Amino acid sequence: YGIVEHPDNILFTGIQNIQLSDALVAKEKGLDIKLIGQAKKLKNGKVAAFVLPQFVKNGDPLSFVKNEYNGVVIESGFADKQFFYGKGAGSFPTASAVLSDISALRYNYRYEYKKRYHHTPHELTNEYFVKVYLSFDDWKYIPREKFEWIEEWHADADRKYLIGVLPVQELIQNSWWKENQTSLILTVDPIIDNLDIIHLKKRSLELAGIQ
């Protein structure tokens, strides 16, 4: 999308808070948990970008990416989905990348960023919503009023979880979702556009007989 942004301005967290119970829930639902960096153009032309744990379906190409391997999925209007797979760590892949850079320097080769210099870059936005799975030890750590809605919740003696929709701004501005052993994982199709939220709210009111 031609965007160059500092990492501090991108919503991210790792897999450090994922619990065994989360893995068991994933297995029951036929899902895997992967750390995914995602960039998607919204209906308003702006771009949503983040790096967060996410559920993927068994059989999804990303579900087969394990250990030192990385996978990249690219989707375009003309080429549909393309999947790239290969080693992203280890001595040989690292040595190959370093050798490639040394060779590029020797021949004065420079990487091109045509979209940055010859096109108007798209704009990042945090004005959208995400559908999340959230597991936790106690309800007192969870600000339920911050959710647009909660569509599922489950409670055991030791661990609880819910599935609901949150504004991304809530995750950016607050840290409760990665404290007190709280685990947040995006659902399979997590991004909900502002326009979709407005439509869903209107439809809910119509079904309730308010409009």
Regions found by a protein language model. Give the residues of each.
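Residue-identity detector for glutamine
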Residues: 16-19, 38, 54, 82, ...
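Catalytic, metal-anchored helix/loop core of enzyme active sites in primary metabolism
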Residues: 48-134, 209
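Context-gated lysine
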Residues: 27-29, 34, 40-46, 57, ...
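A conserved regulatory-domain signal marking ACT and ACT-like small-molecule sensing domains
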Residues: 100-211
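Substrate-binding/catalytic subdomain of NAD(P)-dependent oxidoreductase enzymes
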Residues: 1-64, 69-71, 90
